[in-house]
Structures are given as C-alpha cells and as structure tokens.
C-alpha cells in the first residue's frame, strides 16, 4: 500500500482518534455461473416464431445440431437446439390448445349438466349460438324440462330351465334433437359451425344432460393435422436442414 496523506477532522472536544486500515490481498471476483436454461412454451406457432427471430444466430441455431419432435396425439411441436451441448441446449415447445370456451361446453366429454344449470350456461353464452332467438327458446325449454318414462319389465322362467329377463325404458322429453354452435375449437383458429346433440340420462328423479357432437370430433382430427402441417411447411422453408421427427 502506497503512503498517502489523510486529513482527519475531529468533533469538538476530541483530541485524538484511532485509525484502522484493512488491506485486502485477494481480488473480489464474481462467481462463475452456468448459463440459464432456455425452456420456452407457447402456442403451436412458437417454434416457427423462435426460429424466425434466431435463425441468424449461428452459435444458437446450427441446423445440423437441432431437431424437432412432432407428437400429433398431444398436438405439440418441440424444438431442441445445441442437441449435444448440455450447457447451451434450448427447447421451445409449441402446443395446439383447445379454445377455453369450447372446453367449458364439455362437448364429447364425460361432463354432465342438470337441466337448469345448462339453461343458465346457454343463456350466458348466447354469443356462440347461430340463432339468438333459438338460444332463448332452448333456455326456456331447459328451465322447464319435462320427461315421461315408459318402462317395460319381462321376467319369466320355464320348466326346462329357459329364462327371460328383459328391461326396457323409453324417455320422451321436450328437448330438441340438436342445435348449432359457432365457436372456435382451437386457440388461434377460426370459428367452426358444429351441430350438437343433447343426450339425456334419466334415473328416477335424477336427470343429467350431456353434449355430443360427431361433427366436432371430425373437425378436431382434421384441424389438428392441418395446423401441425402448416407449421411444418413454414419451418421447412425457413430451416430446411433441421431434422423433423414424427413420434
């Protein structure tokens, strides 16, 4: 430590002070940290968007060291960069997600409704019905749901051991056979017009309703593959040397 002159000012009434000097012999270096892991997730277009903005960064996007996994059942695309470099590897996952309101309807699921409960839900979501007037009529029908049940029981036994044991139940109600919705099935995709059937399950006084749409199931299969194929086409044009693997 070089000799340096210092000036010390005393408070009134003080005549002396003790000065302590601490000399550091080691440099105070910052610790060396591992790079942060890049693990991103978003909509089905996320992989293409990431590549579009980073394709010029050769250290990050070496196409021969990247690959994309395609899972059509889970409706996902997963990009992995720097595949052999655990310190600098990055993953970007894009997923085709269902439109939240479509899920709320519970179409083609095990979800069931009480008639009054379903009428309230339809009333609050009239914007998704093709015909607003028909929506109000359907709401009224559900609020005043009526059903009659015709049951037949046949039970007999013959001397030769033959036995008959049959039970049949026919439910007649004021519910319409079907109605039409206009709603997106997947996020970021256009709205689809689908025909929806109301299925009634009557057990004594317990009445549960469910919504079924074969047409929606067809659209799910078609749109899932269409959306994924559209993204793969864009990716192949942008980065043709990235390996694309179907799972």
Predicted regions and their residues:
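A glycine-rich, hydrophobic loop/mini-helix early in the fold
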Residues: 85-119
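Membrane-inserting effector segments that mediate pore formation, membrane fusion
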Residues: 110-160
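Alpha-helix boundary/N-cap detector
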Residues: 35-42, 109, 113-117, 133-140, ...
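Amphipathic, membrane-inserting segments
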Residues: 43, 57, 62, 69-71, ...
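Intrinsically disordered, low-complexity segments that are common in secreted/host-exposed effector
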Residues: 10, 106-112, 153, 158-175
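An N-terminally focused, membrane-permeabilizing/fusogenic/translocator signature enriched
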Residues: 1-85, 239-247
